[in-house]
Amino acid sequence: MGPCSGSRLGPPEAESPSQPPKRRKKRYLRHDKPPYTYLAMIALVIQAAPSRRLKLAQIIRQVQAVFPFFREDYEGWKDSIRHNLSSNRCFRKVPKDPAKPQAKGNFWAVDVSLIPAEALRLQNTALCRRWQNGGARGAFAKDLGPYVLHGRPYRPPSPPPPPSEGFSIKSLLGGSGEGAPWPGLAPQSSPVPAGTGNSGEEAVPTPPLPSSERPLWPLCPLPGPTRVEGETVQGGAIGPSTLSPEPRAWPLHLLQGTAVPGGRSSGGHRASLWGQLPTSYLPIYTPNVVMPLAPPPTSCPQCPSTSPAYWGVAPETRGPPGLLCDLDALFQGVPPNKSIYDVWVSHPRDLAAPGPGWLLSWCSL
């Protein structure tokens, strides 16, 4: 026997492109559903018409204009309008042409004397129960009787204004930092570096403000890769950095220590709100750099390089092993919201790559 002429060996045929596409999911919860019966809403729009009668299409358009809930993709309410017009005795059909009573496009009128009083009041819906539980006053009228029976003009409820901006940590902490971000704090004047300007003029440095008077979000440029001659940190010169990024604006208070010039203690100063957050919540992309805290009382006084104020880049010290503190006392100064990859720095220049003879005091990096 020969092979069947109708059989084919090959991939199955693709589905026909004539199939209708899938309908997207409807969203019904944009506006509050009016807590009225369909009878009350139909009677309201009919009585508001100049001739006190409307066609079915006009009733649907007027209900959409008065109640924003019915402007969405939901279409089932139109069938409820048709059902209430034909099932309630208070609605009567007014033929457009008396000779053709069965023709389409007829008008509908309402006999207000046949409307039950309870049908015009607020219904026991989830919206009304939410108002009662929350103690809030609803935007809908409690009774539509004065508008339907006495012809008072009905004003639709106004929707609440949309929020100006989305939720962000920055909005909770006082905005983006432009201007005066904290009440009562004066903006910080930028210090004039020594040696800048004309050679014949002497630069006058601006005295820095105390930590309690510094703005919440001052910005300063990062140090460039060039070497600063004559500048020393804890007795050692800073070498040229090959890892320094391009100059850009960085938060100054996140890069500065809490020590105040003049030897005063910063224990009574309020910590910055941005410094108290994990680095993943900062509004700009920064490395894991956090604001240093005051040394805890459990830190070892004989080895200052292991206290939190000196974490970052510290000079290599050669001493007996007995001077080192245990890890429990060392990590008691670490806030609970910091990870082991966060680095404590006490000076903006600490972001530069360390020179020879320097080491990172926190070895878990």
Curated annotation (Swiss-Prot):
Motif interval(s): SMAD interaction motif (SIM): 327-348
Chain residue ranges for the region called SMAD-interaction domain (SID): 273-354
Ranges for region Disordered: 1-29, 151-215
Tissue: Ubiquitous.
Xref: SUPFAM superfamilies: Winged helix' DNA-binding domain (SSF46785)
Matches recorded under CDD domains: FH_FOXH
Pfam families hit by this protein: Forkhead
Subcellular location: Nucleus
Positions of the DNA-binding region: 32-128
Protein's recorded name: Forkhead box protein H1
Organism taxonomic ancestry: Eukaryota, Metazoa, Chordata, Craniata, Vertebrata
